[in-house]
Amino acid sequence: MDLDADFLLLHLSDSALPTGAFAHSFGFETYMDAERITNAEEFQDWLKVLLKVQLTSSDALAMRMFYATPTASELKRLDERLFAGTPAREVREANARMGTRMAEIVAETYSVPLIIEYLELIKNRELSGHPALALALATHSMGIDVDRAIHAHLTATVSSLIQNAVRGIPLGQMAGQRVMFAMREHIGAAVKRSAMLDAIDFCSGDPGLDISQMVHETQRARLFMS
């Protein structure tokens, strides 16, 4: 058992990591405003779609593709494609902010090949930054299996969104925990599904999700930045 690898995985996939994830709804606030998400069940339905479509074909597939070709040129290509493949401006900006913070945390705490170069390219505005790629750099350097790395990232993302829903909808704390437990099988399925996707599937979207994320940009009263 590699305890250092386990520590890195638990540390960087902690939903409390200061990346700014608490400030983003990734579109569920638009459904709240339209009264289409009013309770735990409706939120869970939305979360399952986000996980199955957007997170699987973008975050999970990007991590898997980097593991297959862990080079600086592939990192650059994936960062550019993730940015270009995200229709909603707020979501692009959210991923860039969180990706920058994740890269800064990794650079500050772990000796990871490519992370300094990645962070410099982000700060020079040559790349945008994405949390899934920053995490993949760290987990790959520690020899952590790609499925474990993807599972940890998706679990952290789902957990952060549930915490935001608890505050925003609002949901009770135990209702949030029930949603988290119910999502475990969907997270596992997303990891498996990402292994079946090809490059042509990269950043596949869902019209409803994409539109709700774009509508949020003009929503007058809101709690979240996306």
UniProtKB/Swiss-Prot annotation:
GO terms for molecular function: nickel cation binding. GO terms for cellular component: cytoplasm. The keyword Cytoplasm applies. Keywords: Chaperone, Cytoplasm, Nickel insertion. The keyword Protein transport does not apply. It holds the Pfam family UreF. InterPro entries: UreF (IPR002639), UreF_sf (IPR038277). It is found in: Cytoplasm. Its main location: cytoplasm. Belongs to the UreF family. Required for maturation of urease via the functional incorporation of the urease nickel metallocenter. This is Urease accessory protein UreF. It comes from Corynebacterium glutamicum (strain R). The lineage of its organism: Bacteria, Bacillati, Actinomycetota, Actinomycetes, Mycobacteriales.
